Amino acid sequence: MKIAFYGSSLLSSYWNGAATYYRGLLKALSKRGYDIVFYEPDVYDRQKHRDIKAPDWCSVVVYEPTAHALMQVASCAAQADVVVKASGVGFEDEALLHAVLDNARPDALTVFWDVDAPATLSELRNHAEHPLHETLKRIGLVLTYGGGDPVVWDYRALGAAECVPIYNALDPETHHPVAANPGFACDLAFLGNRLPDREARVDAFFFDPARVLGSQRFLLGGSGWGDKPLPANVSWLGHVGTRDHNAFNVTPKAVLNISRDSMAANGFSPATRVFEAAGAGACLITDAWLGVELFLTPGEEILVARDGADVAEIVRTLTPTRAKAIGAAALRRVLAEHTYTLRARLVDDIFKAHFERRAMEAAE
């Protein structure tokens, strides 16, 4: 079965938090027999910051950010059995969605894969004229990066034929325990780009604890922080490529996950970083959000902080022995229940069920 997948980038994680999600899922789907072509625009300098080579489990087509190139790649949707348009591609998303739907065969399954569902739904609720309201009627299936029942209910209320969350997970071939790297040694590390809808939470959950714990060392990775005034005990690394994620996660005493505003408000939205860190055997501290216990057990496999004061207290009292035990427990859990192999099995079942239903309807 052929999949045409239109997304932000498979080759680069630069300003592209969905990269490892796409890689893990599509690699696992390829192992289940899918023939996949991923179409990504050359925008935001991502091609200058590639952190993987073109994979052997998926063809990648990089296109210029022009209307002509967009229409050319959209025409390729006609060759696919499953046509996926992801949210947040980064170049003319609305035009691309309409173009791929126009070019998809009548017998193809059309999918809108929302990697930012809480934010998308908020925009739809606040803008009755948003074009996606009408376009949803043309889409066979909505898959989401997470969000649980609240996202499913909202999408169905807006007219989606079907909506299923496909959560982030672990690819143990790329994210796994490694030897510590002294360059990442610290008491607490946070990896995340500077985003308008997360910065206040980063201030509260990372920078404020750093100021309180002035004698401890904090490490910041991610793009966009260059002009941010930092506490003296915070070191900024800039963009940290995928190849360095394991060492970044496993070396500090603990690593921190901070959700974006919309993800925290909605809940049920574990970030890729959660599973990447757990897969490396890291001790992970996360901001509190609804549903965390469905993925990792608080206090045993993950530490949950309600605010910056909680983060400071956790870091102050956390011993290396306990940190290692929490990381080991998290690793066992994600290997057993949260791999992309398991997520791909769910996606495969959904796709096959769709085509089986269609075949039965045609036979009636």
Model-flagged regions — what are they?
Residues 1-3:
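Extreme N-terminal starter segment of soluble prokaryotic enzymes
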Residues 6-7, 15, 19-28, 32, ...:
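Extended catalytic core of nucleotide-activated donor transferases of GT-like folds
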Residues 7-11, 21-24, 39-46, 50-57, ...:
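Catalytic binding pocket for nucleotide-activated donors in carbohydrate/polymer assembly enzymes
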Residues 9-12, 42-46, 89-91, 116-118, ...:
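Short, solvent-exposed loop/turn segments at secondary-structure junctions
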Residues 30, 104, 156-157, 210, ...:
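Anion (oxyanion) recognition and catalysis
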Residues 34-37, 110, 162-163, 216-218, ...:
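Hydrophobic anchor at the start of a short beta-strand
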Residues 171-254, 264:
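Conserved catalytic-core segment of nucleotide-activated headgroup transferases in glycan assembly
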